Amino acid sequence: MLHLHILSWVLAIILFIATYLNISKNQGGTPYFKPLHMVLRLFMLLMLISGFWILIQSFMNGGANHMLLTLKMLCGVAVVGLMEVSIAKRKRHEQSHTMFWITIALIIITMVLGVILPLGPLSKLFGIG
């Protein structure tokens, strides 16, 4: 399930940037905008379901840091919301650059939290998790 979660995160980030850039300020969305946005929503759904499943498994194992897991879950849900809001603002021709960069910053924070959690690569490298 962890590999599905990581794959959905990577593809969602790529699709988010592609969807965001496929909206012209003057003409609106390109012909590729709608399919990209729908596929992005699919991967966001996969990301949320797999993340929730990993959260439940980690809570049941008992050896995880519950506070960091909950913080990563909240950051992940916030990233999904910010992705949708920044795309919607860009589609309505409103100022969306700030929202885009806030989303990118929160994506980086969420990825750092994922790396240092017990199932992350740093924990496995040093034998912590």
Curated annotation (Swiss-Prot):
It is a multi-pass membrane protein. It holds the Pfam family DUF1516. Keywords: Cell membrane, Membrane, Transmembrane, Transmembrane helix. It is found in: Cell membrane. Its main location: membrane. The chain crosses the membrane at residues 1-21, 36-56, 67-87, 99-119. One of its GO terms (cellular component) is plasma membrane. Coiled coil: none annotated. The keyword GTP-binding does not apply. Belongs to the UPF0344 family. This is UPF0344 protein SAB0838.
